[in-house]
């Protein structure tokens, strides 16, 4: 199996896909490699090098070979930096494809490369992680082209909202398979020791209410809405604290510098999100579009942080019975945060019975079954030769 990544940078889709690869390799029945189009990307006001990325390190640490075409360019949502590829890039890609039985494309952006003429023809499984295909620039057209050419044999949707959105965009329904996101339940769990240690590291009292916002600094996340709600909530909650983490959530971001106080903590990208969530009372999401199955809601909820989210993607069904869905209104969000803090014990009481639904094990088993089926059904159909 060969996975194509647009690049290694902070984001839930890369975390999920990398975790799936780790699980499939652990199973021992499949061999996986990764080809990354970019070795460094510039987005969310940060330069993110492949070799510094936690997903890259986890994959290589597990023995998964990762190569790159070496591109370095700014990226915007849904847009590959260029759809023109050099001769050496195509040659490197051809060598990588030649050794694979099945190609996994992390989102539709890498299809701009896979649609190039003369590359080895292999069955492609496209892993979709958004609910707004129309906002993916030329990537949606690249997906349509690959499907029309007969190379795409399945699309994995991480949420029902993803399936519905792509079906509405004209993607054949029989290609769309829903495999909901899952997380490592041994890692993401309530942890009183980690809770106290995290709070102590930031000077937050043990009894103070804490809201965490785990997101990259991007328009779809509606950071301004979160900040308006945070200012009002902090004014009402004199002991409250707000934690913001993710790519671009640092004082180096001029748009956030003025927000910093002794009760607003900008942490940037963290590798210990289980501790961040365990140390929080509420995990907030204020996104306006694009979300499918937000990883922050699942991870936070599994650590006993009450999810409070706008109604985007599958968020409402994910938090049903365990959190609060709000309109995109600061006053409503503030009220919901306070209610979540006050009634936290109520919202977390039924979580033990719901944990299996969000299991990484369940997710990986579903991917393995689909890939086994694809391999069996297409082994000879799309491999007429290296120049297909």
Specify the residue positions occupied by each region the protein language model found.
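Short hydrophobic beta-strand element within catalytic cores of glycosyltransferases
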Residues: 305-309
